[in-house]
Amino acid sequence: SRSTIGASSKFTDFSIPKITRKNVSGLSYRLMPSDRWNVSAFAKYYRQYNKGPVSQNTDGIGNYINLSNTASALGYGAADTYFIWKDLQVKLSYEKAFRLPTTDELFGDEDLEAGKMNLKPEKSDNVNLSFSYNHQFGKHELYAEAGLIYRDTKDYIKRGLDVLGGTSYGYYENHGHVRTKGYNLSLLYSFSRWFDIGGTFNSIDTRDYEKFLAGSSLQESMHYKVRMPNLPYRYANINANFYWNDLFVKGNVLSIGYDSYWQHDFPLYWENLGDKDSKNMVPEQFSHNLSLSYTMKNGRYNVSFECRNFTDAQLFDNFSLQKAGRAFYGKFRVFFGK
């Protein structure tokens, strides 16, 4: 369905080279006042150079010229961990972070994704607090973790949908202010070298905090404090693995694995618009995968087989586009190192 005219499509110009270079440099300092207390501080320097087609039209499509830009930023943060007692640890961290745009966000996919070469990096203030518990009793081990997340983001890179000439396409833009709050829970149990089972649950609430419409200081946005569209906000996974050590030959391992992913249904567009009963939704989905692998010579050789989505459930991406159904994979790996 690509619409091509000469060396151009609706969403890009193939004759203009597309270049991006990312560099991230970091420096950290760690202090251990005691065996139970650990403090670290760090700084990161981000730099990105982009060169490629930029549209001169107001809708960002067509009439491309070749332009370049460079973005740089300094991020920093600190983290603190403390053992309340032997098996219980608390972690607290803060980071002034930046997320550089990806290749698809900058240049699209040259088909049905329109990139935006002059996207700004996302900048955010991130705070994380978590408690973790790890206890061993005989051949058994239990690990549990609970965490809180807070993220205040400016220039949030948002993907949207539009229609041009009867063709739907995706596009990217910087959205002024977004705030994220949430929590995650994890639990893992393992028995010796034979078995483990675990799972995670996440609840992430991302909302629009841009109070006024772009270009206006008076008109309040109807999406203010409304959950951002196209983002799942409750999801979970479970995985279990069985290991048969020294099968046939000492050092060889047979492993059988199962994992699943659940995701609730969520609105395709802004949830405060449209009739509740007829609203476009990304459906709830629940997928299951199975894997079998045999490792030989202490990891030098590995043969694996996998069946993904073995129940052939209908799965969708964040824009309600259906993913592939049941699929089978095989892989053989050889490690040539010592």
Residue positions per predicted region:
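Extracellular loop and loop/strand-boundary signature of outer-membrane beta-barrel proteins
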Residues: A7-P17, S28, T58-L67, D111-L119, ...
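Signature of Gram-negative outer-membrane beta-barrel scaffolds
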Residues: S1-W85, L100, L213
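Outer-membrane beta-barrel translocator domains and adjoining extracellular loop/strand segments
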Residues: R2-T12, K51-G60, T102-E110, Y156-L164, ...
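Residue-level signature of outer-membrane beta-barrel architecture
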Residues: I19, Y29-W37, S72, D80-F83, ...
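Conserved C-terminal beta-signal and adjacent last beta-strands/turns
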Residues: R30, G77, T81, L92, ...
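Membrane-embedded beta-barrel scaffold of Gram-negative outer-membrane proteins
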Residues: F83-E95, P121-K181, N202, D208
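Transmembrane beta-strands of outer-membrane beta-barrel pores
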Residues: R2, Y45-K51, Y94-L100, F107-D109, ...
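Gram-negative outer-membrane beta-barrel transporters
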Residues: A144, I149-D152, E173-P267
